[in-house]
């Protein structure tokens, strides 16, 4: 594509409005238009960066990363994406948090969400656990938002779970 307007024109032809304020759990839950929009936006961001056009959509904010398994590519890709959009990354180390002392998923999820715009989770160690855990986190922050505890509900991005790895599809 030659210019940014071409990406905008392409996006205007796609139906991806349901993704707004939504989470990204599983690749196969997305429509063809939604997946095409993800790739088109990625291409547009790449174009903007290559042409020295700011990609920052946040003046400040946090991207929380939670890696329950070792990671190199996914960890640095998430950090790079957050930085590209204007977010600071804070890694949640469960061993150094109150989770280690029995704090519940609901308590932890709501606490880290006070200033978070996005939460990226990689939990792929045990079959039947990772995706379920991600849904538990989203359910907790959704309820926190509905109850007025949270000013906003952060978006959850599945960085890899036991059944999908959308960031490397």
Annotate each predicted stretch with a short phrase:
Residues 2-76, 80:
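Positively charged, low-complexity intrinsically disordered leader regions
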């Amino acid at each position: 594509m030659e210019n940014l307007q071409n990406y905008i024109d392409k996006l205007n032809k796609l139906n991806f409005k349901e993704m707004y304020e939504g989470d990204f759990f599983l690749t196969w839950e997305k429509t063809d238009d939604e997946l095409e929009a993800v790739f088109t936006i990625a291409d547009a961001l790449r174009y903007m960066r290559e042409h020295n056009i700011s990609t920052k959509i946040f003046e400040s904010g946090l991207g929380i990363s939670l890696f329950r398994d070792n990671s190199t590519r996914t960890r640095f890709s998430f950090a790079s994406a957050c930085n590209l959009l204007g977010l600071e990354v804070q890694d949640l180390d469960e061993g150094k948090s109150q989770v280690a002392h029995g704090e519940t998923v609901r308590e932890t999820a709501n606490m880290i969400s006070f200033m978070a715009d996005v939460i990226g989770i990689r939990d792929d160690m045990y079959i039947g656990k990772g995706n379920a855990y991600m849904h538990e986190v989203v359910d907790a922050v959704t309820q926190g938002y509905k109850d007025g505890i949270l000013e906003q509900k952060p978006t959850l991005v599945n960085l890899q779970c036991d059944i999908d790895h959308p960031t490397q599809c």
